[in-house]
Amino acid sequence: MTEKLLVPDIGDFENVEVIELLVKEGQDIKKNDPVVTIESDKSSVEIPSIFSGKVESVNVKVGDKVSKGDLLINISSNQSLSQKESVPKETENLIQEAESTLRKHQDQNIPQKIIETEKPKIIQVVKEGDIDPLETSEWLESLSAVIEKDGNQRAHYLIKELINKAYMEGANIPYTQNTPYINTIPVNEEKKSNGDQNIERRIRSLIRWNAAAMVVRANKKFPELGGHIGTFASAATLYDVGMNHFWRAKNNKFGGDLIYFQGHSAPGMYARAYLEGRLNEKQLDSFRQEVNPGGLSSYPHPWLMPNFWQFPTVSMGLGPMLAIYQARFMKYLINRGLIKDEGRKVWAFLGDGEMDEPESLGAIGLAAREKLDNLIFVVNCNLQRLDGPVRGNGKIIQELEGIFRGAGWNVIKVIWGSYWDPLLANDKTGHLVKTMNETVDGEYQAMKARDGAYVREKFFGKYLETKELVSSLSDKDIWRLNRGGHDPHKVFAAYDKASKNVGSPTVVIAKTIKGYGMGKSGESVNTTHQTKKLDIDDLMYYRDRFDVPLTDQQVKNIEYYKPDQNSPEIKYINERRIQLGGFIPERTTYAKPVKAPPKDIFDNMKVSTGEKEMSTTMALVRMLTNLLRDKNVAPRLVPIIPDEARTFGMEGFFQKIGIYAHEGQKYEPEDSAQLSSYKEEKSGQVLEEGINEAGAMSSWIAAGTSYTNLSLIHISEPTRPLG
């Protein structure tokens, strides 16, 4: 029989050119053999055959333009016939008999035989590795009783002691740092927001629309400008909850929280500032067009927008490392008595793909060792990076949880939204959580690119128990099951718990959907990150999805939407930010100038050394020593040493001004009798970074920008060349 090989769904490769024919008429080919090569303006791809057989005709030629559904070749295939003939007659009869019996049972609504044959498999999977289910049940019941009687802390202590005892007895089985693939905070412990959720959703929707419109308008004018829609679409709720309830601005009475915004989400911050009245429409239309005054930078950077952005967060990996050292520097100043402890927080927003950058995770150990409970990471796990899934065959949330828990961080997972709560409460057999644990990110991504029927089949259909769990739900209900990062209630509870944590840094790992709300144009598809343009149908869908009050003509014009100044939305935005001290992001300074040292402070360096040679490092030490003698400058001097003080003759600073250590010195150093003894103290002035040039540079940036971020001028000095 003749099979037609058509152009499959090839994503962006629409109306593209055939640049190479890889088969010819009469040629025998196998399934998956490449047939033609097509090429767009960005890349090329081969199209494979999905049949085996002989090529009857080639229906395209080099130079032709093809799209999905176009005929490429005809293949003479006897595959179906040979497969049919290979089935023995008696086997075919058995198959027909089985099908007939199955139909009979279905008609009579008697599924007992199917259940009886499948039930042993399910029990075997669920009880895998359990040689004594009764004993297991007794242990679990005992643990539940402890939690009920004495609370979570007692249960945690007993489990820790059991693990220690197992190790002492030689049971050195690797212990996982992972918890089940569910939310960290139980429903009954969630702190509820006092905000108006209806107004907050309307505000969030308008910000989403204006952010997307800004990027689309810019690229309609100049297609080469670029920009990103999908990142902020996935993180809008994460930012909105922080803006409305948690992030306190800097003013003349309070130092303010410090927020490191994820670089690719910048359009969302501009869109919010537009509603706040801090940016106008002309400025939005200058997105990525900084050649003109008032243009908005592609990404956060204080050099480009010195009154707006506080921190640079692109290239990837800069944000997390700089945030860690910023939080440490804040603690350093508090412990030295230079600033008050106001309970300020440093928040850093990161992407799950960004966490592959070595700098993203390279300093998390320091954050735990220094007990930086003023630091909160929020990792937006939309499961996608630029080209595809972050961990298609794995689970990035579980991976990050293990890494951060292992390093000593407080981890809060926000995976499932509120619509999942009843299902999890009714998961008496544990099969729902089991399915959640087993499903890999590639599957989760694909599900959100499909529909409710697909999720019912591919996710809930894995076990009879999970299938039964949603038997009363429609496909629409299943599709409505939301992810935690898009649920303001779950996000609020996580932020509240993170803000109150003491003794360790916190990471909130939130599961979201890249391109959330973009529909077919970009929701949970691999090309989302590159989406800069939306056609009219996409824009109409986006408007309807988020109930943006624009007419069809206004949508076609890609107009921004800003409510009247007296509208409930604008009033609410302003009221929330007034209560939190002002607007964010905003870059200002309240630093007082430092009195300059006297002119003669360096007189001793003007005198010739005669025949005595002096290295540059020697001169530097002398210069710093002179500055440390000045009562105005000395407290503001921050020597930053990446582990080579002794190499360059700077060990004298150890005793003179001390090495900063947040816990002081718990030991007597072996050189305690020496003048240059290694003296650590809580009020120490030297930042001894170890063999860590990136960390030293991060500390230098924190100190060098303290005039604006901490309202205190410092003289920071990396004491050896970096690079």
Segments and roles (model prediction):
Residues G195-I207, A211-F222, H228-E370, N393-G394, ...:
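Cofactor-binding active-site loop characterized by glycine-rich and histidine/acidic residues
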Residues M1-T37, E46, I50-S52:
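Acidic, low-complexity mobile loops and tails
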Residues I713-G723:
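Single conserved hydrophobic/aromatic residue that forms the stacking wall/gate
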Residues D12, V23, S40, V60, ...:
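Short, conserved catalytic or interaction motifs in soluble domains
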Residues K30-P48, S67-Q83:
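Short hydrophobic beta/alpha edge segments that flank linear recognition/processing sites
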Residues E85, E97, L102-V241, F349-L350, ...:
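Conserved acidic/glycine
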Residues N78-E97:
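Intrinsically disordered, low-complexity mixed-charge segments
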Residues G255-D257, R344-K345, D373, G503-P505, ...:
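Short coil/turn segments at beta-strand junctions that form active-site/ligand-binding loops
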